A protein has these predicted regions:
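Conserved ankyrin/ankyrin-like repeat signature
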Residues: 20, 54-55, 87-88, 120-121, ...
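Start-of-repeat signature of ankyrin repeats
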Residues: 5, 39-40, 73, 106, ...
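Ankyrin repeat boundary/linker residues
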Residues: 35-37, 70, 103, 136-138, ...
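Ankyrin-repeat inter-repeat connecting loop/turn
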Residues: 31-33, 66, 99, 132-134, ...
Length: 335
């Protein structure tokens, strides 16, 4: 009987029917019951997600647990924060909601607000004691600032920094907020982070820099910004790979051209002796290969096993690349 009443309660919540909610509660529905058909959400979570302040108030007054968690570890405050329901979030905190609670992935309400760009919610949470430097320690080790940088939420990023967020904090893989912004091409945030002291030379666990992330993703404007601020165009990761190699491998022609114009070494080799041209050859990036050859890349350079760019093209079945290297090689030799 109680289970049936709980179902009636959940349906009344979905319908936002106050009278039906009260009737279900008066008949014995469990106000803190979990809806097993929807990740174990409680009545308060439904109301908080919907932003229905009146129902939230009603549920709390009747004993709803403000810190209950669903099967994913989400609280009512997390639902309100994610969906930008400021009045509900304010009430929940007033009634004792934990602003630093984390879900099963270690994500907090502030992180959710940062992802979604919910500035007023983020401001409220910080004012009420949310830790701006908390990390989602169960997964990536990312901070709210990293989430904001990745999502392109400049106002949130600015707020977090003003409130003491560490601009050079690293996640479990050693990635910084600047690397996240660079990878996603969020120019304004990258500029903000640098202005606030972000280390453009920082490397992650694999030795990748913000510039390498920008190059790999083809984010020309961010790459240009980083270089203008002093980023080393020839910096190498732990495998000896440069930004130009990453750009060449993924066919990011404009970034490759930018890097070369800013001094990237077309002859640089990684730990295996492979060059940017070899990377372009393996992945069949014709335009990038043509650019590299035009800029002086040695088509006869060999890696540690004696492989040349054309041998890589043959090995990976890139017949058009074989043709291009032969044709371009002859042309530039004649010049």
């Amino acid at each position: 009987m109680e289970t049936d009443l709980n179902k009636v309660l959940f349906q009344a919540l979905k319908d936002e029917d106050k009278r039906a909610i009260m009737e279900a509660l008066q008949k014995g529905a469990d106000i803190n019951a979990k809806d097993n058909d929807n990740d174990g959400m409680t009545a308060l979570m439904y109301a908080s997600e919907d932003g229905n302040l009146g129902i939230v108030d009603l549920l709390i007054a009747n004993g709803a647990d403000v810190n209950a968690k669903d099967n994913n570890g989400w609280t009512a405050l997390m639902f309100a924060s994610f969906d930008d329901n400021l009045e509900v979030a304010t009430l929940l905190i007033k009634e004792g909601a934990d602003v630093n609670a984390k879900d099963n992935d270690g994500v907090s309400a502030l992180m959710l607000a940062s992802i979604e760009g919910n500035l007023d919610i983020a401001t409220l949470l910080i004012k009420e004691g949310a830790d701006v430097n908390a990390k989602d320690t169960f997964t990536y080790g990312k901070t709210s600032l990293m989430y904001a940088a990745e999502s392109g939420e400049k106002e949130i990023a600015n707020l977090l920094i003003k409130e003491g967020a560490y601009v050079n904090a690293k996640d479990k893989d050693g990635k910084t907020s600047l690397m996240y912004a660079s990878e996603k091409g969020n120019l304004d945030i990258a500029d903000l982070l640098i202005a606030q002291g972000a280390n453009i030379h920082a490397k992650d666990r694999d030795g990748k820099t913000a510039l390498i992330y920008a190059a790999e993703s083809g984010e020309k404007e961010v790459a240009n910004l980083l270089i203008s601020k002093g980023a080393d165009v020839n910096a190498k990761d732990i495998d000896g790979r440069t930004a130009l190699m990453y750009a060449s491998e993924s066919g990011k022609l404009e970034v490759a051209n930018l890097l070369i114009s800013k001094g990237a070494n077309v002859h640089a080799k990684d730990k295996n002796g492979e060059t940017a041209l070899m990377y372009a050859s393996k992945f069949g990036e014709l335009d990038t290969a043509a650019l590299l050859i035009k800029k002086g890349a040695d088509i006869n350079a060999k890696d540690n096993l004696g492989f040349t760019a054309i041998k890589f093209a043959l090995l990976f079945g890139k017949q058009d690349m074989v043709k291009l290297i032969i044709e371009k090689g002859k042309l530039y030799l004649l010049q």
